[in-house]
Amino acid sequence: MVFEVIPAVDMRGGKCVQLVQGVPGSEIVSIDDPVEVALDWVRKGAKTLHLVDLDGAIEGERKNAPIIEKIVSACQKKGVQIQVGGGIRSFEDAASLLELGVSRVILGTAALKNPELVQQLSSTFGNEHVTVALDAKNGKISIKGWTEECAQTPVEMGRKFEELGAGSLLFTNIDTEGLMQGVNPVPTKNLVESVSIPVIASGGVSSLQDLRTLKKTGASGVVVGSALYTGRFTLEAAIETTQQE
């Protein structure tokens, strides 16, 4: 299995941004044309892109849908997979993205509030198109754009959603997200070892060594944002590093 390095294209107000720990107004990067950003990652070797509508995640309104449509259309011609999250609150939201040609829809708050949604989408479109996002803070699940904490642990929820038909999990460690201070591999490893579906890691990657560390957890890939946008390493170097071992 090839460990995938997946560049993040986070959108807020029509721009490509990177926030610190998901806090609005904490932009460390703001670029005017997200479509061009996405195509640039593809030119540099990305096989999958991670698109997030932050307006959707934080306010529940998918304001960046037209931009996502443009990116999907441009990338489909190049055989690049697209996973999309942020503000997918209903079956209709997810279905419209999958019918557009998105490879995987990422359900966060919606899956936790309405687990049947995972089942419905999985049985309609196939589980390979359904990813559940598990965001953890202090070892507990966090929802609503990281503003609310739940009692459950990632392992408990990961097992539950695997049973319900999720084809993969996206695990974000909020404790390290956007800080670029390195990763803590333990929570990711625990989750990987508790389920039999792929786990994509996210949060805190700041060096090529972090990528090697996450690869060793057994994760199927990693979403990288701030480190790529601030030049900690290039995408080419990241892909080369993770394919060496």
From Swiss-Prot:
Gene Ontology cellular component terms for the protein in this record = cytoplasm
Which GO molecular function annotations are given, in alphabetical order? 1-(5-phosphoribosyl)-5-[(5-phosphoribosylamino)methylideneamino]imidazole-4-carboxamide isomerase activity
Organism this protein belongs to: Methanosarcina barkeri (strain Fusaro / DSM 804)
Enzyme class per UniProt = isomerase
Tell me what reaction this enzyme catalyses: 1-(5-phospho-beta-D-ribosyl)-5-[(5-phospho-beta-D-ribosylamino)methylideneamino]imidazole-4-carboxamide = 5-[(5-phospho-1-deoxy-D-ribulos-1-ylimino)methylamino]-1-(5-phospho-beta-D-ribosyl)imidazole-4-carboxamide
Q: Which UniProt keywords apply?
A: Amino-acid biosynthesis, Cytoplasm, Histidine biosynthesis, Isomerase
What is annotated as the active site?
D10 (proton acceptor), D135 (proton donor)
Protein name according to UniProt: 1-(5-phosphoribosyl)-5-[(5-phosphoribosylamino)methylideneamino] imidazole-4-carboxamide isomerase
**EC nos:** 5.3.1.16
Q: Is Amino-acid biosynthesis found in the keyword set? A: yes
